[in-house]
Amino acid sequence: MTVKLAPSILDADFGYLADQVEAAAAGGADWIHVDVMDGQFVPNLTLGPMVVRAIRRATTLPLDVHLMLVRPRDWIAPFRDAGADLLTFHLEADLHPHRTLQAIKEAGVGAGLALNPGTPILQAVPLVELLDLLLVMSVNPGLGGQQFIPAALTRLERARAMLQAENRADCELEVDGGVKLDNIADVVHAGATMVVAGSAVYGEGAVEVNLRNLRGAAA
């Protein structure tokens, strides 16, 4: 199985955003990961549907929009209309996640659920039938460039076992936070099928080369 790579534009140069997205596509990215933060659920404030619409114009790659905000259900239609292909929200941010997942599916886009590092994996079990993607955070959400939390490897293994036990091995298992050349093989071995990488792609060096190196290290 070939792991999917989803560069996070949170670490891109926003002055040249279209170029940065195009460079990711040229380097073999499978998805573009877009971090949306509201300054309430997480301390940082990033972007909204207008920027997602601009990214949509810049690429044909599918857009993985990660909603780190309160009241995620209110934002399904705006981000769907802006061009999102998959919407992921945090279990911790929603009192009625089942309704939100149903609303995302009804909107015609993929549905993802994110779990913070301190949230037990088993809390996703009642919702797994509605998921296209389960996101295991390997940092605390809200800021780019954080260090990978090693316990995320065990959590990925538990998540993979849970998906298999629930007959949902087809569900993407994504990891986000601190993934670099020296640990990408570990997260793939632990069960991740989709990897978000920010500073490892948009930090030092050429974006295309960085992505190819990550792909090689993941094999």
Roles of regions detected by a PLM:
Residues M1-T88, A93-H96, A103, G110-A111, ...:
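Conserved N-terminal beta1-alpha1 strand-loop-helix module at the mouth
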Residues K4, A114, L135-S138, E174, ...:
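Conserved beta-strand segments that form the floor/walls of ligand-binding pockets within enzyme
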Residues H33, E174-V175:
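Generic enzyme active-site microenvironment
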Residues G118-P120, K180:
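Short acidic loop-to-helix transition motifs that present clustered carboxylates
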Residues G178-A190:
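Acidic, divalent-metal-coordinating active-site segment for phosphoryl/phosphodiester hydrolysis
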Residues A192-A197, Y202-G203:
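Acidic, Mg2+-coordinating phosphoryl-transfer loop and its flanking beta/alpha structural elements
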